[in-house]
Amino acid sequence: LDREPRPADLEDDVRRGLGVITARSDALSRFMTAYARLARLPPPRTAPVDIAELVRRVASLETRMPVGIAAGPDTVVHADADQLEQLLINLVRNGVEAAQETGGAVRIGWRRDGNRLEVYVDDEGPGLPETANLFVPFFTTKPQGTGIGLVLCRQIAEAHGGTLTLANREDGPGCRAVLRLPVGGG
């Protein structure tokens, strides 16, 4: 900067350099925010949650494509509604992103299996090429991803005494995410 005469492209070089610094700073900020969210998941504050109402609300929040609903039996679970909503929003968002790759659809539904509730999100995307890293913190295949979405989802499921699994569908193309929760407590 102290050189005289200044190179003709100095301003362009400085702008490019500042652009790189800004991009890396933004990426680091996203990483740190994600890390903090992972480290500070609060314990669930449970109350009765009507699953039909929760599923309808989550489906209505998606604006990129309509999300089908496969209604199940009337079911109430004791859970943290905000945490379950965040979990389902993330699963639906992932399903929509996958379905947009193929022009497919997304459906969310639920069913009872004895004293367990299964909430599932089916997409008609390309499916999962590999499942080993699905729940590895900070692993992502998305350009702007943080790699914590499914990790947080699994933490929420487990904090409620439940499980979360993802697998390629057997009944057609795409993936099925299944949240299993105890009915009547957790």
Q: Where on the chain are the PLM-derived regions?
A:
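Conserved catalytic submotifs in the C-terminal HATPase_c
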Residues: 67-76, 82
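Histidine phosphotransfer helical core of two-component systems
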Residues: 1-26
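Short beta-strand/loop element within the Bergerat-fold HATPase_c
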Residues: 103-115
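Short alpha-helical Gxxx[C/S/T] motif in the catalytic ATP-binding
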Residues: 149, 153
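Short conserved segment of the HATPase_c
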Residues: 128-138
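Detector for a conserved hydrophobic position within an alpha-helical segment of the HATPase_c
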Residues: 157-158
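Conserved micro-motifs of the catalytic ATP-binding
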Residues: 41-44, 76-79, 141
